[in-house]
Amino acid sequence: MLTQLKTYPKLLKHYEEIKEAHMRDWFSKDKERASRYFVQFESLSLDYSKNRLNDTTLKLLFELANDCSLKEKIEAMFKGEKINTTEKRAVLHTALRSLNDTEILLDNMEVLKSVRSVLKRMRAFSDSVRSGKRLGYTNQVITDIVNIGIGGSDLGALMVCTALKRYGHPRLKMHFVSNVDGTQILDVLEKLNPASTLFIVASKTFSTQETLTNALTARKWFVERSGDEKHIAKHFVAVSTNKEAVQQFGIDEHNMFEFWDFVGGRYSLWSAIGLSIMIYLGKKNFNALLKGAYLMDEHFRNAPFESNLPVLMGLIGVWYINFFQSKSHLIAPYDQYLRHFPKFIQQLDMESNGKRISKKGETIPYDTCPVVWGDMGINAQHAFFQLLHQGTHLIPIDFIASLDKKPNAKGHHEILFSNVLAQAQAFMKGKSYEEALGELLFKGLDKDEAKDLAHHRVFFGNRPSNILLLEKISPSNIGALVALYEHKVFVQGVIWDINSFDQWGVELGKELAVPILQELEGHKSNAYFDSSTKHLIELYKNYNQ
């Protein structure tokens, strides 16, 4: 456990020594701070100079990582050891993008051989759709792709297809359906021509309630309009491991793409779950996405901690959560294409590390994952940055931006990028009472009025942030960015001594929904309901009589 590690009391003592120090003073005294706390990897860079840390902090954090045998645990993951202890599974999403030739054997399975076999089938299928060779039941080319999934079967593909829209096939329109609220699927279907639509049903077990409900609605809509169930074979494909259920649905087994239990949903966009990505972007760009992630994997595996991006970000996060008692972390991308990135990271981070039980089954006496949230930064400035600047919470921020200008939008990117730098500087530097008062007096305000108003114009500053810069939004850079956050989450899970690769917290609500659904559908259930739940069930039934 973190609190039992030999470096932990040293970090506590160090925190007490520097907790009142202000970053603007560090910048003033250390002209090399920005260059020393900056790491470049390929086309991605991290400026972590605007954090409440110094060389001693970093030294102690690296010692903490060594206390946890972080290096050895990184190797254990890459080699296929069963580090998902509660489910007795290996964790090998890294194998999905590996360019190594050294085979990984897992329970007599040749992992890389299996992965590459599925990728080969995905490429062939993707090519057939993109080229127009795969036709619908009236011999029309496919124009619309509907991905039906939820959680990891939805968020990653949605995020990547949105982020890389500039690379997408101009004929293809992408649609993503996850919500079991019928509004979403019906809104999508009403825009579509069944003869030119391809549905991808993404569910490992092919029994996920929300996904199957939406898929059956899509199937009914399609059959009613096409006039024959036999046409399903040309318009529905599955990403699943349940061949029997897929065939019962009407999907040809040759149109089922497999993935494995060593790939968790939130880590699965690199697998067959990414079929929609490959169809939209093409195999060349999908390969670049995989390569970017692979290069980050190699960096994570081999770079020293001092220049290792995932290790640095993970340890800095632990510093705020477990010593400054920060409860929240903001993701602020300054790029319209990255608008879905915050909610993708929400699942990745909170479903992985939102745990309170250690690997040994003990209750953890310290905080783990913060609440992760965010929005596009430029919009957020006009929504909730007020709280970040002048509120009472310490909320570390990841600013994410690209250097590449968008074509045909002269002046836009300069405004956007200037705001990234200005916000990070403002959070770090702040504005003192004396500075605020001087500004007001300079503007000609009455002295007494200026003294009162100046209190409201003080920015304490000392608000920490990272700045992640991509040269441009490209497949390889998005691959590297996602892998960076995956590994950051892993680092923190190791420090906290938790299993980052199960998600038992999603189960209880699903279990309790079963008897409630029986009641709502008019059947009697023997389950016990508390008085509140019972009252609300009756309210629903009475309204819908």
Curated annotation (Swiss-Prot):
SUPFAM superfamilies found in the cross-reference section: SIS domain (SSF53697)
Main enzyme class: isomerase
Keywords: Cytoplasm, Gluconeogenesis, Glycolysis, Isomerase
GO biological process: gluconeogenesis; glucose 6-phosphate metabolic process; glycolytic process
CDD domains: SIS_PGI_1, SIS_PGI_2
Keyword Cytoplasm carried by entry: yes
Catalytic function, reaction form: alpha-D-glucose 6-phosphate = beta-D-fructose 6-phosphate
Record's subcellular location: Cytoplasm
A single MF term (Gene Ontology): monosaccharide binding
One GO term describing the cellular component: cytosol
Protein family: Belongs to the GPI family.
Protein name: Glucose-6-phosphate isomerase
